[in-house]
Amino acid sequence: MRPSVAAPATLALVLAVALAGHTQPGKGSEGHAPAAASKHYVLPATPENVQWGWYDPGEKPRLVINSGDTVSIETISHSLGQIKPGLDMDGIVKLRKENDGGGPHSITGPIYVSGAEPGDTLEVRILKIVPKPDAFNFNLPGKDFPTVGLLAPEFPEGFVRYYKLDLVKMQTQFKPGIVIDLQPFPGTFAVGVDPNEPDAKAGPPIHDAKGRTSTLRPWKNGSNMDLNELQAGSTLYLPVFLKGGLIWTGDSHCRQGNGEVNLTALECAYKEIEIQPIVRKHLKTDWPWAETKTDWIFMGYDEDLNQAMKIAVEQTVHWLSSQQIVPMSREEAYALASIVGDCRVTQVVDIRKGVHCMIPKRVFVGQRQVAHQGS
């Protein structure tokens, strides 16, 4: 299944991108306005609520919510928050080896969304992101990890630097003379996946004997997407594989370039990432896709970067030829993707490489910019 549009007779909802509830993602931390009738929950990053490197579909949900409710989720940084000032590269390597096969990510969850069934789509609105004040970036020693990081062999000893974040200016100093604006987004956002699904097992060691799935690789369930467009005000669409969806998030980033070439971003933690999951019964989704105030974004992930590009373009063409804003043929969709589509390398360091293709909403002139129709 791919992103598609329900038949007009079944349409129950129109998502208008130009609604006032959408604000420009970026320096600000506010996004959509949640529905007035929704309930609000808080999920703290306690030891009971955080797992290290694995999605386990057998985990008891830490929250059970209804579609449209909002949740403020706290996150902690890699390796259960153990990477902090004073820890040197030897200590980071030791932590990496302690969780062999699993990802380095600390993930908070899972959250069960009542009514979500396999075949549905979860629309996840990112309402607000409030970072904590500490961050780091590192690349592992290329002599020990020659394939981890794009230029790993050229940096045999590895490198780590810790940063203090100015959360008023939303900036950090890289070094004297270089200041970086913060653009927080969740590097990892996932729904649960059936461990018996053959594609989920591709590329060991993505799963283990317990039926858990590593957080390391991105896939159809989202996971380690590292898509830097998922800032406050954006919306992520994920296919549902398991009853209740089962939502996790972690790998919190405060800034990342496309490619994430040295292995890590400006890795941080969130005091709060507020989300609003909504179950869409008639919106069918294959690969994750997203939207911001300005663009629709379609993703592809594969060990082969060319194949990741192909998947992203296929999703783009299918969506364009299915949308109801300005109907078009597949041939026209393919042409439009080539003329205005902006396909970017999401990341090249998560074994499964990523490409995302962005279609600007502004080209649909004089039209109400409807993201999709379905319920």
List the predicted regions and their residue ranges.
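N-terminal, Lys/Arg-enriched amphipathic/low-complexity engagement segments
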Residues: 38-99
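Intrinsically disordered, low-complexity linker/loop segments enriched in Gly/Pro
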Residues: 128-231
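A generic structural signal for residues embedded in beta-strands
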Residues: 73, 121-124, 238
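Short, structured beta-strand/loop micro-motifs enriched in basic residues and often containing a Trp
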Residues: 46-56, 100-108, 213-221
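Short, Lys/Arg- and Gly-enriched loop/turn segments at beta-strand edges
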Residues: 78-90, 129-140, 244-254, 347-349
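Bacterial N-terminal signal peptides
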Residues: 8-20
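Conserved mixed alpha/beta catalytic, RNA-binding, or beta-rich assembly cores of soluble enzyme
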Residues: 182-188, 195, 199-306, 317
